[in-house]
Amino acid sequence: MHLSAVFNALLVSVLAAVLWKHVRLREHAATLEEELALSRQATEPAPALRIDYPKALQILMEGGTHMVCTGRTHTDRICRFKWLCYSNEAEEFIFFHGNTSVMLPNLGSRRFQPALLDLSTVEDHNTQYFNFVELPAAALRFMPKPVFVPDVALIANRFNPDNLMHVFHDDLLPLFYTLRQFPGLAHEARLFFMEGWGEGAHFDLYKLLSPKQPLLRAQLKTLGRLLCFSHAFVGLSKITTWYQYGFVQPQGPKANILVSGNEIRQFARFMTEKLNVSHTGVPLGEEYILVFSRTQNRLILNEAELLLALAQEFQMKTVTVSLEDHTFADVVRLVSNASMLVSMHGAQLVTTLFLPRGATVVELFPYAVNPDHYTPYKTLAMLPGMDLQYVAWRNMMPENTVTHPERPWDQGGITHLDRAEQARILQSREVPRHLCCRNPEWLFRIYQDTKVDIPSLIQTIRRVVKGRPGPRKQKWTVGLYPGKVREARCQASVHGASEARLTVSWQIPWNLKYLKVREVKYEVWLQEQGENTYVPYILALQNHTFTENIKPFTTYLVWVRCIFNKILLGPFADVLVCNT
């Protein structure tokens, strides 16, 4: 009886092993889906995509990885992969070469000069590069069994997920528009963050961008030793960024800003809807000034006095808000209905993007910190189409500042420096321009506490805000440009051996009849063929006869374009070749 039981148990074990051998491939896919399900929020729907494991493995082993990228250099490149893999043991991505592999661009060793692409939107930062290791697909036979990710993946780095300015400027805005750059990606993609940070203080904001829970690099190790993405996009669009942080040259606005307030406000509208924040605005007579209160450093020492003075000057109530004491949804709700936002310089001012049109931003700077040298929020507020007023106030009184030399270096302490350097910093009246990120004089000054000089602040605000601050309904402010003028032609007449006239005429751009434009002018460039210079004219009518310096029997080149409201310059029509 005992031997029979043992024999039966062994037989069951053998049969189980045989069955396992036949089903193990499908269970690899099931395992991944179970792991991903654990990472989802309770409200997240089940995945629409499932992996046929044997088929996926066959495609990878025979065909290999496929890559096609957009962008000419590593700083503006986004790549689309099929069957890109990631080794959790080596912590590197793998491109498997198979029979149908494609690698565009095929850079050879230039792929390492310095990288294929930037994983974050901070341009050309040597901690943010993406690359992969190459292997023949046949190497898969000697590697751990791959686990296939069923979701479309967007793979990127967050730059600094604990700082709200970096979260919005470097991550959320670029993620939002990268997801919309490719059809369907916003509704299908799962975000994979590979920089190695933990969730950070604002992880809930990243969750708003996709219906699927984002995954961190550390979580990938629980899914398998070798992960393979059936479909992945790698990199982020930098087109929405407006500021550079001073890694190569002192910080300031980007040289070529490509985003306007229109795109910022569409993103802000999306975020407020996801946060369930109302757009109704405040009733007439209940407008308020919102003051950001900091609780740990860079304090406003006379905050109560400031609140009272603002209320008296502008005849509206004042409200305080802080990131520490309010949910982010409450912060957005208060900012999006405020008439004026007042704050010390700091990451919380990125919430300026939620202010209503016509509102005012007042940024306060501690002693010795020049507002002209630190302008991420000014640049944001002044983007075309944001329609905000911006005010910068600087404490000019050393007696109104409280310093903290005894703190750790990263909170502005300077006691670790030699005495001569400490003395120099204490006597300095302005922090000189500097690179990011550990300049001790900058850290010492930016972490000061400030007693705001109320009269000088009110005077500074009043230079910009003449009446009662507050949101206002505005007409479309983003400039619409004219098209080309149409049917441009020229006619010449000669009077004697030395006198000639050249008449140029054209029709209005066809889109003008659909627009309400305050002022329409035309710019005409006149150039004698063979000369290097031209003569420009600004004209109000659609035709003009030129007589000055017009020579008989001469060829002239003529360009004409339309201008709206003095600043919106349309394209030149095709060049006219006119013979007198």
Swiss-Prot record:
The answer, when asked if Isomerase is one of the entry's keywords, is: no
* Entry comment describing in which tissues the protein is expressed: Highly expressed in the brain, muscle, heart, and kidney in both fetus and adult. In the brain, highest expression in the cortex and cerebellum. Highly expressed in the pancreas.
- Enumerate the Gene3D superfamilies for this protein: Immunoglobulins
Q: Where in the cell is it found?
A: Endoplasmic reticulum membrane
Which of the residues are on side Cytoplasmic?
A: 1-4
Parts of the chain on the Lumenal side: 26-580
Q: In which pathway does it act?
A: Protein modification; protein glycosylation
Where are the annotated glycans? 99, 276
Reaction equation(s) it catalyzes: 3-O-(alpha-D-mannosyl)-L-threonyl-[protein] + UDP-N-acetyl-alpha-D-glucosamine = 3-O-(N-acetyl-beta-D-glucosaminyl-(1->4)-alpha-D-mannosyl)-L-threonyl-[protein] + UDP + H(+)
> Where do the TM regions start and end?
5-25
Q: Which domain of life is it from?
A: Eukaryota
Q: GO terms for CC? A: endoplasmic reticulum; endoplasmic reticulum membrane
Any one Gene Ontology molecular-function term assigned to this protein's record = acetylglucosaminyltransferase activity
Keyword rRNA-binding in record: no
Report the record's Gene Ontology biological process terms: neuron migration; protein O-linked glycosylation; protein O-linked mannosylation
**What Enzyme Commission number(s) apply to this enzyme?**
2.4.1.312
The record ties this protein, via InterPro entries, to: FN3_dom, FN3_sf, Glyco_transf_61_cat, Glycosyltransferase_61, Ig-like_fold
Matching PANTHER family: GLYCOSYLTRANSFERASE, PROTEIN O-LINKED-MANNOSE BETA-1,4-N-ACETYLGLUCOSAMINYLTRANSFERASE 2
Q: What family, per the record?
A: Belongs to the glycosyltransferase 61 family.
Disease listed for this protein: Muscular dystrophy-dystroglycanopathy congenital with brain and eye anomalies A8: An autosomal recessive disorder characterized by congenital muscular dystrophy associated with cobblestone lissencephaly and other brain anomalies, eye malformations, profound intellectual disability, and death usually in the first years of life. Included diseases are the more severe Walker-Warburg syndrome and the slightly less severe muscle-eye-brain disease.
Q: What is this protein called?
A: Protein O-linked-mannose beta-1,4-N-acetylglucosaminyltransferase 2
List the lineage, top down.
Eukaryota, Metazoa, Chordata, Craniata, Vertebrata
Gene that encodes the chain: POMGNT2
